[in-house]
Amino acid sequence: MKIGETTPDFEAETTQGRIRFHDWIGNSWAILFSHPKDFTPVCTTELGYMAKIKPEFERRNVKIMGLSIDSTGDHEGWAKDIEETQGHAPNYPIIGDADFKVAKLYGMLPADIAGDPKKRTPADNATVRNVYVIGPDKKIKLILVYPMTTGRNFDEVLRVIDSLQLTAKHQVATPVNWKPGEDVIIAGSVSDDEAKRRYPQGWKAPKPYLRIVPQPQ
C-alpha cells in the first residue's frame, strides 16, 4: 500500500453492522485505523481519545473506522472499559477482522497468517497499529505506522487532514509545523505568471523556489 493508490474495497462485520468499505466512505474523507488487540492499555487510551474528538473529524467531513482481529463481541465488551477509564466509549464502527482478511489485504499481517486470533498476543500483531487517511476518491493520502509502545497522536492526524483538504482545493503546500491560518507555500507546479494571477498581492520569496503567501480561504 502506497500513498496515491486506490484502497482495496472489502465487506466486513463491524460493531455497527456489515459494511462495504467504499460504499461506507461515499463522498466523504475517511480514516481506517487499526490496533493490535482489544483489552490492552495503549489501545484503550487511543480509542477513547478518538471517540472524544470525533466531532472534530465530522466537522471536516471525515468518517472513522476502527479495526482489529478481535471479534465484534470483544469490541463491544471492551467498549465498557474504554468508557469507564477514558470517559468516552467508541462512537464509530470497529471491524471485527477475526479471519485476518482486511489486515492481510492492507499488508498489516503476512498473507500466510492463519489460526485462532484469540491465541495471538499483542506482540504477534505488532504491525497492526496503522492509520490510513483516505480521500473521497478512495485513494490513500496518508499512512502512519506506530510501534507497540507508542500511542498515536490523533491531533496530528487532524492537522494533516487540514493540510490535505486545503492543498486539494488550492495549489499550495504547508510548511513544517504548519497550523490552520498560518502562511503556506505556493506549489512548485505553479509558474510565477500563474502565481501573479492567483496572488496579485504578491508573495515573500527568500529563495525563488520558496514563495510564501497567506493561507487561501
Task: Tell what function each PLM region has.
Residues 1-217:
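Chalcogenol-based redox active-site neighborhoods
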